[in-house]
């Protein structure tokens, strides 16, 4: 198990990753991450056909001052593509109103391969193309836990 944290408020632009500054890293080398970045590498080191990881993000998100009031969301992305089933949506009523969101995904990495993952600010309004997402959100108390489950 590995845990990655970032307690300070950070502005995250649309389609960009949340950055993680502190870590309790994996001691077996299954997960690679440099503090201060938002990209993680999961390794398919296994005697089986695949390695499986459970990735869970928890954090507080808000629209910064000056932003438009729209639904906001984060999602876990794999190889640069958001897993929309992991999308966590919050709809604030005013700017600077934080909401706690949690997102989880099971990620299967084939033997001998490596997958990159990140937690990204994604468009929460994909169902309504007339709504324009706010360009940035604030993220605070970001916490990412990665467990190797198989």
Predicted regions and their residues:
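Extracellular jelly-roll beta-sandwich "head" domains, especially the C-terminal globular C1q domain
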Residues: 1-150
């Amino acid at each position: 198990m590995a845990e990655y944290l970032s307690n300070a408020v950070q502005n995250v632009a649309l389609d960009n990753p949340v950055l993680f500054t502190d870590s309790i890293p994996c001691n077996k080398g299954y997960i690679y991450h440099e503090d201060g970045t938002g990209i993680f590498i999961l390794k398919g080191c296994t005697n089986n056909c695949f390695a499986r990881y459970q990735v869970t993000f928890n954090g507080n998100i808000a629209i910064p001052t000056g932003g438009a009031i729209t639904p906001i969301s984060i999602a876990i992305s794999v190889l640069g593509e958001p897993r929309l089933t992991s999308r966590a949506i919050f709809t604030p009523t005013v700017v600077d109103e934080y909401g706690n969101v949690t997102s989880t995904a099971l990620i299967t990495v084939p033997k001998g391969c490596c997958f990159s993952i990140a937690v990204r600010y994604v468009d929460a309004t994909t169902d309504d193309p007339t709504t324009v997402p706010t360009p940035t959100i604030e993220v605070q108390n970001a916490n990412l836990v990665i467990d190797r489950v198989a």
